[in-house]
Amino acid sequence: MTSVRRGNSKQSVKTISVVMAFLLVSLSSFSQIGEHRNDLSIGINGGYILSNVGFTPKVPQNFHGGMTMGVSVKYVCEKYFTTICSLLGEINYASIGWKEDIKNAQEQPVINTATGVAEKYSRTINYIQMPLFAHLAWGKEERGMQFFVQAGPQFGLYLNESSDSNFDIEKINIDDRSNTIVKQYSMKVERKFDYGIAAGAGVEYSVPKVGHFLLEARYYYGLGNIYHDSKRDYFGKSNIGNIVMKMTYLFDILH
């Protein structure tokens, strides 16, 4: 089992490397045959994140909601026929985690015997997230609307975490739960560095001398785990997943 999990970790690193190499090769290919651009813009972004953690053994969950905000930098390097090619990087604060769906065998809320109310538990984990995207767009270059897609690696640095529950962990109603996995309640994040793949799509509206307004939806799949995953460890998998909806405002520095 240990060798399998180590193999998964190596495969994740290989996946990140392949994606980064593909992005660099793709942009390099465009640069050799496209129309050169040298446009740089910076700005701010903000939005809402729906997140969960993919546990093995499984922990039933609903989405955890949280905010994200940060700074964005976009460099437009080429136009290849109708495709506008850019690099987009961000440094964001993100509040993510998981929210448990605690039910009994009849799919009803589990009532805590000590408090008399339905048990609730969520964990919030705050990160600095740093995605780097190959950004491909089609539409108006100077004034008007563009549609874009983007994909690339994302890295995360752990800041802190907090739990929110309405019961004493020592007095859980474990007998009525359809899922009895509760080890996570006493475990803090063990791996402080997160990495994975992100991809998204959206629209951008540009107004000369005013700036660029972007609206997008994005998905992130973590290739690392928040807990150790050797044969001796409890969880074999504990990777983060995010659905992000955000707006970005950029203004030109070079054009």
Can you describe what each PLM-predicted range is?
Residues I44-Y48, M69-Y75, Y93, M130-W138, ...:
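Residues on the lipid-exposed face of transmembrane beta-strands in outer-membrane beta-barrel proteins
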Residues C85, A94-W98, T124-N126, A137-F148, ...:
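Acidic/histidine-enriched, beta-strand-rich ligand/metal-binding domains
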Residues Q32-D39, E78-C85, G139-Q146, V207-H212, ...:
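Short loop/turn motifs that connect adjacent beta-strands in outer-membrane beta-barrel proteins
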Residues R37, D194, A199-H255:
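Predominantly the C-terminal beta-signal and adjacent terminal strand-loop region
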Residues V53-F63, I96-I128, Y158-D194, N225-N242:
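Extracellular/periplasm-exposed beta-strand and loop segments of Gram-negative cell-envelope proteins
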Residues H64-G70, I84-S86, I125-P131, Q146-F148, ...:
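Transmembrane beta-barrel architecture of outer-membrane proteins
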Residues M1-R37, N45, M247-H255:
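Bacterial Sec-dependent N-terminal signal peptides
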Residues Q32-K74, D252-H255:
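Short glycine/proline- and aromatic-enriched beta-strand/turn motifs that initiate or cap beta-hairpins
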